[in-house]
A protein has these predicted regions:
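C-terminal transmembrane-helix exit sites in multi-pass transporters
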Residues: 7-15, 60-82, 98, 209-228
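Hydrophobic transmembrane alpha-helices of multi-pass small-molecule transport proteins
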Residues: 4-5, 79-96, 205, 226-243
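Specific transmembrane alpha-helical segments of multi-pass solute transporters/efflux pumps
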Residues: 12-57, 93, 177-195
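Hydrophobic/aromatic residues within transmembrane alpha-helices
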Residues: 43-44, 70-72, 76, 127, ...
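Specific alpha-helical transmembrane segments that line the substrate/conduction pathway
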Residues: 2, 42-73, 113, 197-216
Length: 245
């Protein structure tokens, strides 16, 4: 989050937004900057395998569409409701895989992260009139402060932990901050200026395709039959969501 803040700060013209944007902006910043990052990293810390976490993160799509229906009044038809339920069923199948019994807690944490990601996408629609660089810069700042404070009070020795990070970890953090947060997330939130959530969010379904391929080549993870079936159900259902107009 700090990397995101530093990268976007030089490109932002600081201007206090209208009061009506205060709560949505703070909510967006806390959901995306703290909720998503915190629970996603917790889930990765508890997980033995990465692939189930990649699939679990796809729940952000149905969560976002459900939230957009409730808070924004975006129309969700019967086919979309059906596909949303099917996607949750796919996650349940993965959770019941005997080989992944130890991953249930990690998948649960990932689902919470996906929930916050969906909420963040809805809140971003409320602040779409604000420059996307500014909103993501504020999100990076608030996310950094909240995570730092949480680390100080819950873990302690935060400065010591930072000093002991090796060069490979710093490179991964730079990749996450620049490529994922600055380029990918900022670009996606920019699209909400022109398109509804149920049009943009389903393209997020491309994420597991690349993720599962990388986990195979990097970690050598081969899914079991039940996990493969559940993963296929999730990927196909969220892909079909973006085909419905």
């Amino acid at each position: 989050m700090f990397i995101l803040f530093v990268c976007l700060l030089p490109f932002c013209k600081f201007k206090i937004p209208d009061k009506k944007y205060f709560l949505p902006l703070i909510g967006f910043s806390l959901s995306m900057g703290f909720g998503v990052i915190f629970f996603l990293n917790l889930s990765l810390g508890k997980a033995t395998f990465v692939a189930p976490i990649i699939i679990g993160a796809q729940l952000a799509i149905p969560f976002a569409i459900l939230a957009s229906s409730i808070f924004l009044g975006e129309k969700v038809n019967i086919k979309q409701w059906s596909l949303i339920l099917i996607s949750f069923f796919g996650i349940f199948l993965i959770g019941y895989d005997p080989n992944l019994k130890g991953e249930i807690y990690a998948i649960f944490l990932c689902s919470i992260s996906a929930f916050f990601y969906g909420i963040a996408n809805v809140l971003s629609r409320y602040i779409k009139e604000i420059d996307v660089k500014f909103t993501n810069m504020i999100m990076g700042f608030i996310g950094f402060i909240t995570i730092l404070l949480f680390s100080i009070f819950s873990e302690g020795n935060t400065v010591s932990h930072l000093m002991n990070i090796n060069i490979n970890t710093w490179l991964l953090l730079l990749h996450n901050g620049i490529v994922v947060s600055v380029i990918a997330h900022t670009s996606m939130f920019y699209l909400y200026k022109f398109y509804s959530i149920n049009k943009v969010m389903p393209f997020y379904s491309l994420f597991p395709i690349f993720g599962l391929i990388l986990t195979f080549f990097i970690f050598g993870e081969i899914p079991t039959l039940l996990s493969a079936i559940g993963s296929t159900i999730v990927i196909i259902s969220v892909y079909r969501l973006q085909k419905i107009r």
